[in-house]
Amino acid sequence: MRWTVGPAAGGKINRTMYLTPEELKSHMYAHIVEEITEGDEQIVLQAIEAAVEEVRSYLRPRYDTDRIFAAEGSERNALVLENTKIVTVWNLIKLSNVETIYEIWKERYDRVIKYLEGVAAGTRTPSLPLLTDEKGEVRIKMRCGSNPKFR
């Protein structure tokens, strides 16, 4: 999420989001979101912010999350966007179980978290921009290890 202040925003803070409330329609009907949040868009925005931050936390050690979440429209990574939507819907349905099947969303959320844990551990490698240093060279954490010892 990026924040801008200026005349175009009427001197107020204007949020430009990685994911908009309208884009959640692909995962949850608008009338259900409306019922869960009682029409309060701030609840939806907070759920999106929390989801972005949760997904970002798994990607941050290795990937350039500022670039990933600054992307707009078709420039966004489809899998990161999909996972962010699922985490957002999970954040919303925790408030209420209106016309949703809790177990299905719990299973989807758990699957996303398992995938993100794999990304964080380095066993899953999405096509995302890697972190770079001041010279523009990719920063790679050095990891050492060995095979289990035989006794």
Describe the residue ranges of each PLM region.
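Ordered, amphipathic secondary-structure segments that act as subunit-interaction surfaces
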Residues: 61, 77-101
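Short loop/turn elements at secondary-structure junctions
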Residues: 2-6, 11-12, 90-151
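Alpha-helix boundary/N-cap detector
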Residues: 39-42, 46, 79, 83, ...
